[in-house]
Amino acid sequence: MSKKPVRVAVTGAAGQIGYALLFRIASGEMLGKDQPVILQLLEIPDEKAQKALKGVMMELEDCAFPLLAGMEAHGDPMTAFKDADYALLVGSRPRGPGMERAELLSINGAIFTAQGKALNAVASRNVKVLVVGNPANTNAYIAMKAAPDLPRKNFTAMLRLDHNRAASQIAAKTGKPVSSIKQLAVWGNHSPTMYADYRFATIDGASVKDMINDQVWNKDVFLPTVGKRGAAIIEARGLSSAASAANAAIDHMRDWALGTNGAWVTMGVPSNGEYGIPKDVMFGFPVTCANGEYKIVDGLAIDAFSQECINKTLAELQGEQDGVKHLI
């Protein structure tokens, strides 16, 4: 019995991340090789962007993906999000030269307020929303607040890129395959303040912390390398990380939809007070996923250094949220 197609809305669909993402969704990498999809693609309603989107859709057609059951181009979130089962909010305004962070927050605040309202009005009541566009945590917070009729838990922010970056650095340090690393956590904001935490991580049952046994490397090499990786890629490539961001979005949605079999992954989710994080703060936590739901890993001990790192990233997030309070 073949499955009924699900509707996947993607914003910023003709952008760099969108281009790296759509073909993988259409091939079944995100929701499974037996799940047909209808892509509902949103771009800004400007002639150049809509024309570029048409070109991407022509390429998608030319792949003849068996699972691609339909495609639509949109310039308005009210039509793009209609009955959406999944929404990947990729499009956001990047920070331009000389632009203050407050200005960036304000511009994106308006975008994500409108998108949250549209999701609230027309999306499936079970829609799973992933915000990729930066500042991802705060944009997800804004969208969630603009959608009071949808469950808070349906809104998430992407911390998976930080998680994957941390895993690859640990693999390089230990000489072990990245697939062998279990129970890694990333806490907080998708920004250089995020706290990648391998205190509970294992490789083949052995403690990664004991294996590395180097707090100076952790503090002075590992955390800054993971935190500033995005900037290092811009410096090297002249463009921001698009393919790795798209890959992380696929990982995040696949695990949320299909489950992690007990494995820990990192998602930015609205807090309910876990680990002392105030309610509603969109915060990176270690989670497990099953039956289409995520659950924060509880009962983890937080030592003094970890608490200091968590407090720092929380303070940054609360500062961002205070900066958009007037939009909500």
Swiss-Prot record:
Among SUPFAM superfamilies, the record links this protein to:
LDH C-terminal domain-like, NAD(P)-binding Rossmann-fold domains
In this protein, the active site sits at 190
Where does this protein hold NAD(+)? 12-18, 108, 115, 132-134
Q: Does the record carry Nucleus as a key word? A: no
| Tree of life domain | Bacteria
Which residues take part in binding substrate?
A: 95, 101, 134, 165
Keyword field contains Oxidoreductase: yes
Q: Which UniProt keywords apply?
A: NAD, Oxidoreductase, Tricarboxylic acid cycle
- Reaction(s) catalysed (UniProt annotation): (S)-malate + NAD(+) = oxaloacetate + NADH + H(+)
Q: GO:BP terms for this protein?
A: malate metabolic process; tricarboxylic acid cycle
User: EC number(s) on record?
Assistant: 1.1.1.37
**InterPro entries of this UniProt entry?**
L-lactate/malate_DH, Lactate/malate_DH_C, Lactate/malate_DH_N, Lactate_DH/Glyco_Ohase_4_C, Malate_DH_type2, NAD(P)-bd_dom_sf
Gene Ontology terms, MF aspect = L-malate dehydrogenase (NAD+) activity
Q: Which residues cross the membrane?
A: none
Q: Which Pfam families match?
A: Ldh_1_C (PF02866), Ldh_1_N (PF00056)
Function noted in UniProt = Catalyzes the reversible oxidation of malate to oxaloacetate.
What family name appears in the similarity comment? Belongs to the LDH/MDH superfamily. MDH type 2 family.
**Name this protein carries in UniProt:** Malate dehydrogenase
